[in-house]
């Protein structure tokens, strides 16, 4: 990983939050659409 001292913590938190919400959303959407079983 790069030097985290140059990256604001709020930026890291925002990116991680978006990724987590996106993964959860895709997971539930896939399960709702019947594609979750293939994952």
From Swiss-Prot:
It comes from the Eukaryota. It holds the Pfam family PsbJ. Keywords: Chloroplast, Membrane, Photosynthesis, Photosystem II, Plastid, Reaction center, Thylakoid, Transmembrane, Transmembrane helix. It is a single-pass membrane protein. It is found in: Plastid, Chloroplast thylakoid membrane. GO terms for cellular component: chloroplast thylakoid membrane; photosystem II reaction center. The keyword Thylakoid applies. Signal peptide: none annotated. The chain crosses the membrane at residues 7-27. GO terms for biological process: photosynthesis. Its main location: plastid. The keyword Transmembrane helix applies. InterPro entries: PSII_PsbJ, PSII_PsbJ_sf. PANTHER family: PHOTOSYSTEM II REACTION CENTER PROTEIN J (PTHR34812:SF3). Belongs to the PsbJ family. One of the components of the core complex of photosystem II (PSII). PSII is a light-driven water:plastoquinone oxidoreductase that uses light energy to abstract electrons from H(2)O, generating O(2) and a proton gradient subsequently used for ATP formation. It consists of a core antenna complex that captures photons, and an electron transfer chain that converts photonic excitation into a charge separation. PSII is composed of 1 copy each of membrane proteins PsbA, PsbB, PsbC, PsbD, PsbE, PsbF, PsbH, PsbI, PsbJ, PsbK, PsbL, PsbM, PsbT, PsbX, PsbY, PsbZ, Psb30/Ycf12, at least 3 peripheral proteins of the oxygen-evolving complex and a large number of cofactors. It forms dimeric complexes. This is Photosystem II reaction center protein J.
